[in-house]
Amino acid sequence: MSAAMPNTAPETPETPGAPDVPALQVEDLTVRFAGLTALDSVSFTVRPGTVHALIGPNGAGKSTCFNVLSGVYRATSGHVRFGERELTGMPPHRIADLGVARIFQNLALPPLATVEDSLLLGRHRLTRTGFVSAGLRLPSAAREERTHRERVREIAEFVGISAYLDRPAGSLAYGQQKLAELARALCMEPRLLLLDEPVAGMTADERRRTAAVIAGVRDSLGISIVLVEHDMGVVMRLADAVTVLDFGRRIADGAPADVQNDPAVVRAYLGERPDEPRGEETAS
């Protein structure tokens, strides 16, 4: 995986997933907190090797949905399935072991560690050498570390940050640190990426570069991506499918162009509400 970072994001082609990447199925997902309904019977399917955007106004339930997908929250009812595996109620570390990686909105790189060492942390679940062997620097441990570092360098080149591997992560510009976060997630060798506002706070150039990398992850690696993002330009360029939430309910689902013109979506973003009862507002 040593391809150079693409300059522009492709226009959402149909891309088959890698053979071992299953579909993610969310079925009738409901989450309640002390009587407040954060998600109300939400369903959608992420096809293998596609970018599926989850959008909606603030308070729509997007972050709650992400927290259920990654195991941080437990659903009140409903199911999340990754292929044949039931993720509902599974703890975060077990979900990660199935190849699900999440990137949070806030930066989480160790600021004083080098970028290379920060990325190496993403290889932790793939490490077979025990603490004793690593501490004694046995030949098997040294060989495994070399293999992991080679992989880290390949991924850094793919993402476009190989020039910064020897620098402290905290010294990088904000956009570069966000790319390093993405590279660290890729170091886990995921089959599904959960990206929570990956271009938030970036300059226009940084947004374009990051969108190009995300497109490359889908097109070159066949990894499925669930994307929460407020930048509708990025969503429309990247997403193969879009699910729209509003007050915890799914109000639209389909191709980006169709969803963009859906009257219910337009009303939600303009602040106009239909007359039927709605669920309670919670954190987005």
Where do the protein language model's features map onto the residues?
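Glycine-rich phosphate-binding loops of nucleotide-dependent enzymes
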Residues: 2-284
